[in-house]
């Protein structure tokens, strides 16, 4: 008999709607013993089977669902099916957009909770973020080796969220050669260098691909400020769009150095690119106080909120930074502003920008809305998968 997680009465509704998480508060009891990450059956209070998932006793998310099909086992064949299904969509995108790099697996939205896989050329970068994902590591790697024999696999499971599920952080080569210090990839006609081993996340923010492309239509002959620039994807795109100048700001010397190399790699005019190592909040105030003005500002900060208790503080941070940006824009200027915080809804983010405009004493028009690129899909039953949102705003 399999180990069963029994839900409290009335707590099965989210699973009936095929949401992939079971929170600790929904659990009545365990029947049997399961190790960290082991596959268990999830049943309602009367014993009716609901789903099969991975058990995580130390996490607020007590189980993550692998399947809602009672006949489906969690084995090599299961992971093969999931990966092949995901690859079909990425193949179409890669051919349509001329991509050599994309998100192959987007966790819950691809039916593989806690698993992120990014492909950069012939390197697969793996992040296992949940106990169930870690438990299935060997099976997953076996399937990847079979389906992608041409690819080396590199582990970037050096993410703090693993500690919440009782796991250590891991990083390093799994199979094949070590990634080069900087790996060139292609995106919408740009060549970009990616630091797989030491860069943010898996090395690069693939989710902003379409937003970087959209930037080009706003920047011709414009002065652009690129905040939280990282390795300069928005800066390179702005230069390709014909901007007169782009100022990239980041606290990381290493990231700015790669940004400079990316400008040179694309044979763009380096004299139009300025790189400033500074705190964005501080620099925006300095620019405001000395009367600097820009025509376009890209505001792409890191995640400000990790849990609900931080949401109010994050709202203040987003409002302050967008208020400063709005103050720095010329009349008719464009603010391209983003939030990658999953707890920040699009409606709330739009309200924050409206409040920022009021505090800045400017009128703002919302003219375009952004989300993560299409290789980061959002399954309908898991709205939390829509974490990246953004707006193009015209400042009057």
Swiss-Prot record:
Q: Pfam families per the record?
A: Methyltrans_SAM (PF10672), PUA_3 (PF17785)
Q: Which UniProt keywords apply?
A: Cytoplasm, Methyltransferase, RNA-binding, rRNA processing, S-adenosyl-L-methionine, Transferase
Its UniProt entry gives the catalysed reaction(s) as: cytidine(1962) in 23S rRNA + S-adenosyl-L-methionine = 5-methylcytidine(1962) in 23S rRNA + S-adenosyl-L-homocysteine + H(+)
Entry's PROSITE patterns? Answer: PUA
Q: Which SUPFAM superfamilies match?
A: PUA domain-like, S-adenosyl-L-methionine-dependent methyltransferases
GO CC term (a single one): cytoplasm
**Gene3D superfamilies from the UniProt entry:** PUA domain (2.30.130.10), RNA methyltransferase domain (HRMD) like (3.30.750.80), Vaccinia Virus protein VP39 (3.40.50.150)
InterPro entries (UniProt xref): PUA, PUA-like_sf, PUA_sf, RLMI, RlmI-like_PUA, SAM-dep_methyl-trfase, SAM-dependent_MTases_sf
The EC number of this protein is 2.1.1.191
Q: Which GO terms describe its molecular function?
A: RNA binding; rRNA (cytosine) methyltransferase activity
Q: Subcellular localization, per the record?
A: Cytoplasm
Instruction: Cite the PUA domain residue spans from the record.
Output: 2-81
Q: What is its main location?
A: cytoplasm
Which PANTHER family does the record match to this protein? RIBOSOMAL RNA LARGE SUBUNIT METHYLTRANSFERASE, S-ADENOSYLMETHIONINE-DEPENDENT METHYLTRANSFERASE DOMAIN-CONTAINING PROTEIN
HAMAP family from the entry? 23SrRNA_methyltr_I
| NCBIfam families tied to this protein | PRK15128.1
Q: What does this protein do?
A: Specifically methylates the cytosine at position 1962 (m5C1962) of 23S rRNA.
By sequence similarity, the record places it as follows: Belongs to the methyltransferase superfamily. RlmI family.
- Protein name per Swiss-Prot or TrEMBL: Ribosomal RNA large subunit methyltransferase I
């Amino acid at each position: 008999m399999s180990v069963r997680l029994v839900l409290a009465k009335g707590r099965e509704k989210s699973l009936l709607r095929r949401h992939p998480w079971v929170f600790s508060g929904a659990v009545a009891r365990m029947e049997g013993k399961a190790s960290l990450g082991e596959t268990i059956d999830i049943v309602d209070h009367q014993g009716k089977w609901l789903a099969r998932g991975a058990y995580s006793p130390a996490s607020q998310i007590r189980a993550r669902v692998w399947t809602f099909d009672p006949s489906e086992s969690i084995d090599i064949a299961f992971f093969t099916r999931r990966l092949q299904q995901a690859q079909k969509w990425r193949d179409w995108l890669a051919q349509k957009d001329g991509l050599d790099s994309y998100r192959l697996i987007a966790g819950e939205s691809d039916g593989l909770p806690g698993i992120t896989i990014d492909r950069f050329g012939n390197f697969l970068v793996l992040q296992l973020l949940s106990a169930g994902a870690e438990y299935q590591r060997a099976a997953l790697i076996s399937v990847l080796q079979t389906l992608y024999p041409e690819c080396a696999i590199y582990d970037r499971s050096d993410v703090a969220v693993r500690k919440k599920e009782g796991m250590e952080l891991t990083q390093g080569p799994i199979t094949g050669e070590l990634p080069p210090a900087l790996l060139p990839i292609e995106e919408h006609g740009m060549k970009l260098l990616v630091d797989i081993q030491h860069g943010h996340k898996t090395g690069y923010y693939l989710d902003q691909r379409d937003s970087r492309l959209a930037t080009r239509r706003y920047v011709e002959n414009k002065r652009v400020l690129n905040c939280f620039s990282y390795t300069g994807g928005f800066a390179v795109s702005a230069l390709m769009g014909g901007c007169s100048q782009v100022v990239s700001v980041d606290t990381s010397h290493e990231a700015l150095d790669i940004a400079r190399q990316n400008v040179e790699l694309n044979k763009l005019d380096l004299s139009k690119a300025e790189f400033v190592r500074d705190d964005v909040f501080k620099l925006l105030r300095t620019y405001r106080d000395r009367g600097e003005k820009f025509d376009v500002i890209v505001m792409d900060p890191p995640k400000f909120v990790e849990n609900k208790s931080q949401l109010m503080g994050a709202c203040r941070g987003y409002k302050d930074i967008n208020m400063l940006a709005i103050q720095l824009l010329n009349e008719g200027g464009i603010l391209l502003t983003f939030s990658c915080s999953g707890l920040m809804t699009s409606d709330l983010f739009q309200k924050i920008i409206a409040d920022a405009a009021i505090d800045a004493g400017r009128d703002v028009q919302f003219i375009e809305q952004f989300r993560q690129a299409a290789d980061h899909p959002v399954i309908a039953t898991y709205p939390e998968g829509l974490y990246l949102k953004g707006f193009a705003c015209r400042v009057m």
